Amino acid sequence: MAAQIPIVAATSTPTVARNSKKRPASPSHNSSGGGYGASKKKKLSASGFAQGVSIEAMSESKMASSELSSGPVEKAAKPLPFKDPNFVHSGHGGAVAGKKNRTWKNLKQILAAERALPWQLNDPNYFSIDAPPSFKPAKKYSDVSGLLANYTDPQSKLRFSTVEEFSYIRRLPSDVVTGYLTLRKATSIVP
């Protein structure tokens, strides 16, 4: 069989300079022998019968080499720990069966479907779950600007974040101070 394999002479190096920016396989170098242009098509059409023989010989040589290398070299595919081996995608059939792939529901659709379910009064929901308070201290925000407040005015008990806010708080009348404190749901010390 090896005697039937045609020997093709090596092609000459491309005439395009190697310093050019384009690769030799680009369409602009069609005239060269190394590119994927009309020259490759000519080679394929010229060797019609010989090509069929060479493909047959190559397939036989691949089979022979695969028989030699069919030892315990291949490792078994180890399943990934984060993937569920029993997972089946919800799109039955998919594009192979000619059906359109099913899309995942967005959050709005999920919440609407959840609201439509027949809930009982004693069923747990997000609002009925009792959780202990957080161990992290609550962040304190300025009563005037809403920025993170590192300071508290000892006189009015209002929180502030900058010197300008402090001077503004000191000039506020007492009824405005109590209004800020009630917005924060803090008890007013000043009567």
UniProtKB/Swiss-Prot annotation:
Give its localization. Answer: Nucleus
Record-level GO cellular component terms: cytosol; fibrillar center; Ino80 complex; MLL1 complex
Q: Where is this region: Disordered?
A: 1-41
Reply yes or no: does the keyword Nucleus apply.
yes
- Domain of life the protein comes from: Eukaryota
- Supply the alphabetized keyword list: DNA damage, DNA recombination, DNA repair, Nucleus, Transcription, Transcription regulation
Broad class of where this protein is predominantly found:
nucleus
Q: How is the quaternary structure described?
A: Component of the chromatin remodeling INO80 complex; specifically part of a complex module associated with the helicase ATP-binding and the helicase C-terminal domain of INO80. Component of some MLL1/MLL complex, at least composed of the core components KMT2A/MLL1, ASH2L, HCFC1/HCF1, WDR5 and RBBP5, as well as the facultative components BACC1, CHD8, E2F6, HSP70, INO80C, KANSL1, LAS1L, MAX, MCRS1, MGA, MYST1/MOF, PELP1, PHF20, PRP31, RING2, RUVB1/TIP49A, RUVB2/TIP49B, SENP3, TAF1, TAF4, TAF6, TAF7, TAF9 and TEX10.
Summarizing the function annotation, the protein's role is: Proposed core component of the chromatin remodeling INO80 complex which is involved in transcriptional regulation, DNA replication and probably DNA repair.
Instruction: State the name under which the record lists this protein.
Output: INO80 complex subunit C
Question: Origin organism of this chain?
Answer: Rattus norvegicus (Rat)
Which gene is this protein's source? Ino80c
